[in-house]
């Protein structure tokens, strides 16, 4: 069983989340990586995140660009801590994703790190796991 579930919305996002893989590995934290879109595969994505606790995951890292629905969507279907990583994309170069990740409605908590900062997302996950 892995401790951290890492989800991004598109295969093209993988290079942006890969720094988290290195941080988690160095810290001895197991993780599992998935590509699943809140927009294109909402049912599959909901099932993946809803079942995370039963599979032994303790933290979710969700990365997305543009409208960046994935972190908030993930937080809406789990009670696990969700860390959102906004990705630089489109004409606003990630500002839209940052605001979407940081401004999730009340009652749907998402911890938000800086644009393209998968390293800090992984470091935060490690701290949560060690708390």
Outline where the language-model segments fall.
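Glycine/charged-rich beta-loop-alpha catalytic/anionic-binding loops adjacent to active sites
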Residues: 2, 29-32, 55, 80, ...
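Glycine-rich phosphate/diphosphate-binding loop of Rossmann-like nucleotide-binding domains
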Residues: 2-40
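Short glycine-rich or small-residue beta-strand-to-loop segments that form or flank ligand, phosphate
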Residues: 3-8, 32-34, 60-62, 83, ...
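C-terminal binding/interaction regions
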Residues: 8-15, 19, 93-131
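Short, solvent-exposed amphipathic alpha-helical segments in soluble enzyme
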Residues: 20-26, 49-50, 76-79, 127-129
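N-terminal beta-loop-helix "entrance" segment that forms/cooperates
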Residues: 33-55
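Glycine-rich phosphate-binding loop
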Residues: 47-86
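Short, acidic/turn-prone active-site loops that include or flank metal/cofactor-
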Residues: 87-91
